[in-house]
């Protein structure tokens, strides 16, 4: 995801830095690419597709130690992007395709579909880090 976090947002995320409540491993569906997805709450609105403009709330953790590295909720501002346009990590483009407005999902993304060998030091994401996200799809247009 090509979003930066301010020092304030990182401090807010650190305050809520606790292990996320995740579904059991066997509840996740696995994609061919290695992404794991669990639908926490199905939505009933419009379905996302390539080119959809999506507004979400999300929280992101390092899979290794569950350290939260970013949260739109902590910023009190939803994140908006266009699906399938490369404006977010490829794991998001894949995992959020076909999801309905109102859906809450948990996503486990391997490093190769996140920030890979580079990581994002400004966000506290080391190289080769698998990531975990909780995403709520607020609006699809």
Outline where the language-model segments fall.
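Cross-family detector of peptidyl-prolyl cis-trans isomerase
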Residues: 1-141
């Amino acid at each position: 995801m090509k979003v930066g976090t301010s020092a304030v947002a990182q401090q807010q995320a650190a305050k809520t830095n606790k292990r996320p409540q995740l579904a059991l491993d066997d509840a996740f569906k696995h994609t061919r690419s290695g992404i794991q997805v669990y639908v926490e709450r199905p939505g009933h609105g419009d379905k996302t597709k390539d080119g959809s403009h999506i507004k979400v709330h999300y929280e992101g953790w390092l899979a290794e130690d569950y350290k939260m590295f970013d949260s739109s909720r902590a910023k009190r501002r939803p994140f908006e992007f266009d699906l399938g346009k490369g404006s977010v990590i490829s794991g998001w483009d894949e995992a959020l395709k076909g999801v309905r407005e109102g859906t809450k999902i948990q996503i486990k993304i391997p490093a190769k579909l996140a920030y890979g060998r580079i990581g994002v030091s400004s966000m506290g994401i080391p190289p080769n880090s698998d990531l975990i996200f909780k995403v709520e799809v607020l609006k699809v247009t």
